[in-house]
From Swiss-Prot:
The keyword Cytoplasm applies. Belongs to the class-II aminoacyl-tRNA synthetase family. HisZ subfamily. Keywords: Amino-acid biosynthesis, Cytoplasm, Histidine biosynthesis. It comes from Staphylococcus aureus (strain JH1). This is ATP phosphoribosyltransferase regulatory subunit. It is found in: Cytoplasm. Heteromultimer composed of HisG and HisZ subunits. This function is generally fulfilled by the C-terminal part of HisG, which is missing in some bacteria such as this one. Transmembrane segments: none annotated. The gene is hisZ.
Amino acid sequence: MNNSEQLIALKESETAFLKYFNKADYELVDFSVVEKLDWKQLNHEDLQQMGERNFWQHEHQIYALRNDFTDQLLRYYSMYPTAATKVAYTGLIIRNNEAAVQVGLENYAPSLANVQQSLKLFIQFIQQQLRDNVHFVVLGHYQLLDALLDKSLQTPDILSMIEERNLSGLVTYLSTEHPIVQILKENTQQQLNVLEHYIPNDHPALVELKIWERWLHTQGYKDIHLDITAQPPRSYYTGLFIQCHFAENESRVLTGGYYKGSIEGFGLGLTL
């Protein structure tokens, strides 16, 4: 496929996404790639993200190029509440001077049934329009870390070693028998079963993970992995997250996660 054909295919995929979810009764939204920001309203996490963002000042006003749709919509709807419970979008995101096209959904009534229906529809779009399918799924939950590791041990060094799966370093700092070390020693496909030995069966994170595992099995997905190493990109990501890796185009990953800040929601996004 030459450059012109790739461009046409990309634009057709964007349009097809909007048509598909418009038909499914999602509200379509179109926000400017240029965000107007107020320094006084930016929190510590906002400021930390400025390192990857392109921003400038004009007449005492700060502007920045969009780097995250969920964050932009959350910021906007916090100021201007919407009656919409599910929205669909397409457009550019720019991170570290690299531009990419993203399509995605935000579910502002994030019941289990609503979120799973959104994921099901998204995968159907991938199958029908992108001619691809989900090869394997990664599940995780941002409450797991607190369940497995005492707050006093959640130092930058230890968190970094967990993220890097540095077992030798973790053994030094935590011990061989520590739950995190024991879980990470297992194959990621087995870690959800192993997790049950280290946290109570009624722990909300484990309950939610098992519900999702069972649902994914009913959808025909058996290759399911647990990730206990991921740390939330923003503090408002407090619950379950999912990554659906593609069978044909291995560089594509449908990602999603629950968040609760000034707005509660569950977002799903795919970079084309």
